[in-house]
């Protein structure tokens, strides 16, 4: 076999730097486990000043979902996971889409056959290797001449890895340490399918080597395949990359997160009102500990402190309440302008009157919001005064009852009518002035005014802010409605 082409491929491989890759299959939305893999892969590269590569693994054509590649690009961009090489930006070792590399895999399969570590299987059986007994396959023992003759005659075949029949294989993982597996427990997995496309297990080994990948980050479910990967690397005479197998993200102590069971993808979390920065920060800590008590980190800070040794062997449990805590912290840390922009679509779900300022409402909400989707239900009183029971005017702490509230609303109505500049300062002065005049606490004035204005006991903001946002005319109208309700209730 002429080795010139293989030598040229070897010469292209970048050397002397950390190179990591995120290699998703475009089969749908980005679930939390995939996002964590992408994040850890990015952090390893950025921490060391290396390169982060995006590769699209589309060899499983039956599972491909239209538009899923765009979802990958969009999600990574939103999360700040910029890649140095990939299908959209190019690079020295492209193409970066597996189906565009199809010819490569066949050549490397032939090379592996030449080296005695793979063989053509012409048997009419399923390509899946589960339950496949290598010792029972006559094709494993065909001479090279017999195999070549069958292939030249057009007889269809798959290429299988020739696992040693005896001995054991030991591989090292950065998290789990050294793991030894008896070769007798490994099957002769398919490397090239009958359609000429490679299997995932073969393609990713070839691509990782040719792209100079130094660290392979993936889920711990691939630990069982790693001995076969090692044997492939050894069969070619290649250096084995560092393996980083991450334990799964669980929905509870017994079940992995699954879209099938309704667990949220990244896109679902954003639609549910979580901020991207909060999601990424939380996902970083799902199975990795930075040490110390601090939990809130920027992407740059994560890249500076990230250490593979902090990744846990134990599965991480996805806790939505903990994510809410992170989200609330990020919301509180936003600039008022940034929060107003993020909150406005949710505010406008409930407040459709254009004269009511979304920015003014956002200012009330920022310190009181955990998740953006909670916003609409807090604001249902702005467009229309809801029906409410006059029992809301009874409040022990404010020392108010229906009769006292009626008296206070009647007293405040002309005072509010006399305000020419309807602003927080003047509205507050009017109510505190009334409290002084009545020799009572401010709450005894503000409670009935707020109930009349909002028709709810729990509101974002107090009486002053709500009255100011509603405007003078609407506030006075609602106070008159409150007076009428109380008069009817009291007979």
Question: What residue spans do the PLM features occupy?
Answer:
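Glycine- and acidic
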Residues: 20-27, 53-58, 211-216, 264, ...
